[in-house]
Curated annotation (Swiss-Prot):
Signal peptide: none annotated. This is Bifunctional protein GlmU. The lineage of its organism: Bacteria, Pseudomonadati, Pseudomonadota, Alphaproteobacteria, Sphingomonadales. Its main location: cytoplasm. UDP-N-acetyl-alpha-D-glucosamine binds at residues 11-14, 25, 76, 81-82, 104-106, 144, 159, 174, 231, 320, 338, 353, 364.
Amino acid sequence: MTDRPFAALILAAGKGTRMKSDLHKVLHPIAGKPMLGHLIAAVDRLGAARKLVVTGAGREQVEAFVAPLGVEVATQEPQLGTAHAVQQGEAALADFDGDVLILYGDVPLVPAETIRRMLDRLQGEDAPVAVVLGFRPDDALAYGRILARGDGAIDDMVEYKDATTEQRAIDLCNSGLMAVRGRDLWRLLAQVGNDNAAGEYYLPDIVRIARAEGGRSVVVEAEAWEVAGVNSRAELAAVEAEWQRRRRLAAMADGATLIAPETVWFSHDTMVGRDVVIEPHVVFGPGVTIEDGVAIHGFSHVEGATVRTGAEIGPYARLRPGADIGEGAKIGNFVEVKNGRFGKGAKANHLSYIGDADVGAKANIGAGTITCNYDGFLKYRTVIGEGAFIGSNSALVAPVTIGDGAIVGAGSTVTRDVEADALAVARGKQESRTGWAARFREAMKIKKAARK
């Protein structure tokens, strides 16, 4: 359905004092993306015609974040309640001929599908003025209550502070999220007063005003997790945990095996293929694609990387941005790859740093190999050819190219290109002195005894 255009109006004017942070509350991340970013992504998926954020304290941070996202900004100063906050969008949206969706920047998990249900209900045959998103929490706490009939029609909405004992016994609570016909919203807001316990202008009052005019408002219900809000670090952690729990379930439903799901942490954009096995304590940062049949062993950290079909990562491996691990390749324990490409079947099994490098198919990188890619000012690239073998404890000083099939002897420091199928050995000549160690020990014993 959702035929009429809609504008998303996101409220983000709160001071967020309980977060005790210099970062604006709505910019704190869930799964690596700011909370506000999750909401913008959701309404973008539904094709929002306009997007507007109402902010107050710390607005410069919010403005900087939304500037490249096609989002307009309005300011609420001072903060006089939710109805007053929505009113700050009138100047931008007064001529908008569509519906207005009201969201909260600190309620980041509401799915696009739930938003669609709200907008579709607003276009129902009974033509409601407003659709309110309600939920039934395990503990209603101090949420506002929705007084609704069996068909979802709302008789009244009341803030907890102003509710009677009987009203507080109702378990249908107001999430604050609402969809309103734009042609009615501003007129209704103009009639909202502040004769209540807090002296604020409450958005839910428009439901009562519309009903007095003969208009109808209805409730659509959501699961409690969808409308969980964040006002403290503890609540931020709880919302993160819920997001991760659901993402893990989705990964397993799509054909991945998570040995200990509760220990795997995804980013908002992690892509995981089928028949992937992820062992305990794996962390995915942003920008990761894991193709089919990959094994990621425990305690590995992957960000900004692509791992191709059948590759094996870890344990204790780190893939940094720009890492591209080829089909059937192996990145082993305590190996770090940054901006490095590994060809099909290439291996770096132990204790290596491979940065700004191209590693050819079937190449074998020995333990302790370091690509020396930085001189303190600029980065340089290392190219290792197909089938090359790099001996243990080697340093490859970039820019340098190791040809196809070449062998670098263990312990070498390579500063010049090595041609294909050549052997390069770059280390000091070994010297052995017969009996020297025994003579040294005896001399040192005498010296030590003389000091007593």
